Amino acid sequence: MNTSHIVLMICFIVGVGQTALALKEDDCEVCVKTVKRFADTLDDATKKDYKLIETAFKKYCKTQKNKEHRFCYYLGGLEESATGILNELSKPLSWSMPAEKVCEKLKKKDAQICDLRYEKQIDLNSVDLKKLKVRDLKKILNDWDESCDGCLEKSDFIKRIEELKPKYSRNEL
C-alpha cells in the first residue's frame, strides 16, 4: 500500500513537470505559427506521407520572407540551407502532431529555431512618423514590399508612407 502511494506521487510529479515544460506559442512563436500555417495548406493525401510533406514544405518556403524564411533555412527547406532536419517536421506532421509539440521536438534538435521572434508591429494610426528613425521608416516600406525611389530625406520617406497608408493600414472599428 505504501509503495503504491509513492508510485502515484511520482507519476503525479512527472505529469505536472511535463505540463510545465510544454512549449507555449509565445516561447516559439515563429515556429508554431509557421508550422500551423503550413499544415493548413496541406490536403489530406499529402498529410499522410512525410515525403510529400517535405516536398510541399520546400515549395512553401520559396514564398516565405523574413522570420519564416529564416525558419525554413534552419530546417533545411531552402536550397541554400546548410543543414537539414526536415524529417523532424514532416514525420510528426504526418502523425497529426500539434504544432506546439512539433516545435518542441525541433527545439531539442536546434535551439535557435525558438530564438526567432516576430518584431513588434508599429501602429501607424497612433505613431508619430516624425519621431521614428529613417531605418524604421524604411522597414515599414519594406514590410509592405514598397520602395521609395529618390527618397533621401526623412520627410521623403514620411511622405511616401502617408501616400501608401490608406492601402496598407488596418482600421479597427
UniProtKB/Swiss-Prot annotation:
Disulfide bonds, paired cysteine numbers: 28-114, 31-103, 61-72, 148-151
Signal peptide: 1-22
Keyword Signal: yes
Source superkingdom: Eukaryota
Localization per record: Secreted
Xref: Pfam families: ARMET_C, ARMET_N
Keyword field: Developmental protein, Disulfide bond, Secreted, Signal
Main location: secreted
Cited InterPro entries: ARMET-like, ARMET_C, ARMET_N, EF_Hand_1_Ca_BS, EF_hand_dom, SAP_dom_sf
Cellular component GO terms held in the UniProt record: endoplasmic reticulum; extracellular space; synapse
Record's keyword annotation contains RNA-binding: no
Single Gene Ontology BP annotation: dopaminergic neuron differentiation
Record GO terms (molecular function): calcium ion binding
Function: Required during the maturation of the embryonic nervous system for maintenance of neuronal and cuticular connectivity. Essential for maintenance of dopaminergic neurons and dopamine levels.
Family of this protein: Belongs to the ARMET family.
Name used for this protein in its record: Mesencephalic astrocyte-derived neurotrophic factor homolog
Organism: Drosophila virilis
